[in-house]
Amino acid sequence: MEIQFTNTADRISVADSVFSAAYNEPLIHQVVVAYLAGARQGTKAQKTKAEVSGGGVKPWKQKGTGRARAGSIRSPLWRTGGKIFAAKPRSYVQKVNRKMYRSALCSIFSELNRIGRFIAVNALELTEPKTKSFLKLMQDHAFGDDLLLITESENINIFLASRNLPNVTVIDVQEINPALLLKHEKVIVDKAALEKINEWLS
């Protein structure tokens, strides 16, 4: 299939398997959940009754005081007591093999292309890293203001000019992930990045 560039009359040939694949929502959901789970730090730690310091002595005798029975001042029922089901450091990583991951990316790119949220441009260039210049470039092409820009390699002027905008993310091809692709309203890809994506996923 061919994709039309927005800012020129040129077209580029791309693989059907990458930009015209079937939409597989269960697979995309699984891969996105796994990606976000893998990004979790997993270092939370709490102490159980056994790990909290103190509490070795029975606070008062079992009978005769009129008070409720108590065996430790570190009971989970007490203030400063231990946690009943204490959280411990753990890994949240979910296994997703390479074929599934790439298939999910192809499905996302294909759906974005079908519904008009995928935009290919010949090139995106700024002569200076100014937010005003970047906004003018986006307005000239009517791209909107909720954007993911994908470049073939790090474009320092585009990155610096856009980093003050809360709904704009600029990445290179190596940083592509399913969560980012779905987060933004439109995905803008330059020609060099599009060729690299096509080669990578086809």
From Swiss-Prot:
GO terms for cellular component: ribonucleoprotein complex; ribosome. The keyword RNA-binding applies. Residues 47-67 are annotated as: Disordered. GO terms for biological process: translation. Keywords: Ribonucleoprotein, Ribosomal protein, RNA-binding, rRNA-binding. SUPFAM superfamilies: Ribosomal protein L4 (SSF52166). The keyword RNA-binding applies. GO terms for molecular function: rRNA binding; structural constituent of ribosome. One of the primary rRNA binding proteins, this protein initially binds near the 5'-end of the 23S rRNA. It is important during the early stages of 50S assembly. It makes multiple contacts with different domains of the 23S rRNA in the assembled 50S subunit and ribosome. Forms part of the polypeptide exit tunnel. Part of the 50S ribosomal subunit. Belongs to the universal ribosomal protein uL4 family. This is Large ribosomal subunit protein uL4. It comes from Dichelobacter nodosus (strain VCS1703A). The gene is rplD.
